[in-house]
């Protein structure tokens, strides 16, 4: 076994013994075996070692400097992590000139991050948060194929299977996730926030133990998160809800005030319910469990609730802004989701 693999195994055994990251047990043992098998330092060991040295030792790359990437980058930098942001085009120009500006508690702050215009194959990060739109995902994964960083957290709304992504960037690198955040830009200043913990924390799936190391990073930055047993099921249920919500904005005569249209809200409620019923009929467990409410409550009641949410500041920040900013992405997701339902019905 090479020196690198021996160091990885030794470090991970020490972490298990001291309880640095709780609850690893069988998952950690499996990772140790992988480190031996592949005769190299395992990505899980690398992240754990960096965490053991302190937050400044953990290198994080934000790949995609839109609303989501900028917010996570700012919050992680606030927590002391070594954060770099990879951007292009006008966003790169803005970041290079002014830095990553964001609103926080009524004040404008500048995040302590490194701004990158290119990513070299040898540039190694403990975590890469991939925060691009669904229709940009494949190109981003292609670019990351040659990079040596071991772990890519895909914070993307998509219906594709994760093995398809790993076929592009490399097996064992993906942690499938979804952000719990929303907002927009006021000029070049980020005006965004995390979604409330009870509604939708940052969510990611189980990946043999690495997800717990990721959770520790987010907890350190006070970013609420949850680990779900079946991320694929979670994303299907999420699409079952957000696709009809986006459709409602596009169908409304006055999208900004779509929540005032009672008939449209009831139609949206019925479509969400039908979508979740179709998923459940395919023996897929609804995730999170609160999705069951759409099936149990009456359509008029759910429609009334949706109308209230659409007209709230929450709806404006976390629903309206994204739907109106990314209609091409939402149309693609609409087509993918209903094509999947039709295919599964055959």
Residue ranges and their predicted role:
Residues 163-238, 244:
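Rossmann-fold dinucleotide-binding core
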Residues 6, 16-17, 34-36, 51:
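Charged/polar low-complexity intrinsically disordered segments
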